[in-house]
Amino acid sequence: MFSARTAWDRTPNLLSTRLEMLVRRGTPPLDLTATSPAECGLGHDEAWLRSIVGAQPLGAYAPEPLGQVAARQALARDLLRLGAHLEPGQIALSASTSEAYGWLFTLLCDPGDSVLVPAPSYPLLPYLAELSSVELRSFPLPEDPLGALDLDVLEAVADETTRAVVLVSPANPTGWVLGEPDQARLDALCARRDWALIADEVFVEFPRRGPPARTVAARPGEALTFALQGLSKSAGLPGWKLAWTAVLGPAPERDEALARLELIADAHLSASSPAQRALPAVLTGVSEWRTRVAQRLEQNARTLTAMRPPDAAWDVMPSAGGWSAVLRLPQTTDEVAVCLARLDAGVLVQPGPLYDFPRGRWLVLSLLPPPARFAEGVGRLARTLERVLQG
């Protein structure tokens, strides 16, 4: 009765089973995986949000497939901060970047076609690809967060079914950032191979090393390119369900992509009308919130580095952006066993394979939790790592 594409293995893993048991016992661990700003004490002023929402007619509905013109005009103005000079007509609104991925897979791929994606990356991407009957092929990211892509390796992963390359910059969870030289080389490769470039930039507002924040849309090239962002990360408003895709490249391909995207979007009409009407006010009022988030990320990153013992067998990997930190363990470590031991010690982190890291040495934690909780969790983490890694 059901499609093969939805026949996912839903068996709970050891980590989720142990976590559920602890929660039932009333002893939940310190959560170092939390990525909701509001849950981490970084929410918005409710009076400000109410003033934005209260200033609009909530019952009004004027559907426009690519999004309301005023919202797209506001985005075009705001993206100037990140170096992009776009017309409002080059921007398409959706309910989320996840939805935008699905639209772009539909736009670019027939069933069975392939898309190149970075590893490590989002756990969600394989599900989105399967729902679109698209095959993902992984290429490795540099460990150096400002390091150059190996385009020979990337190209070797492709075949005649490849239609696009996905890059997340800053990458989640490693914090790798696409530099201008790499973008130019990748643009040339995509143009030569007739591939599209999909740039996921949901963390672009949060650089932590290297040059200031800049979108790939600031450097249009010869390849058809899509740059994705959304209110979930850029403004800490995941519940508002609004994201945007900037479309750039040679005019014929760009305009054809927008015309087809308009039909795809018209079939869904998913972007929230109240969120679209509120968007201009959100964009002009969110800078203080971004500053608070950036300060939290920096503070917790410093805490993590400072609390690592000098002789520890594990390392904190360098990062150039985003909300996560990655720990590298000795090569032979069973990171799932380490995560289970940490749960028993009262702290929750994520094993690397969840993000398509190679098995055996990687852990991921969020840098968003409140500083006191984060410091306590890292202290427990360091003690558990010392005990587990020393046998």
Tell what function each PLM region has.
Residues 276, 280, 296-305, 315-329, ...:
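Conserved glycine-rich beta-strand-loop-beta hairpin in the small C-terminal domain of fold type I
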Residues 218-298:
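Conserved core segment of the aminotransferase class I/II
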Residues 85, 155, 333, 343-350, ...:
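PLP-dependent enzyme catalytic core of the Aspartate aminotransferase-like
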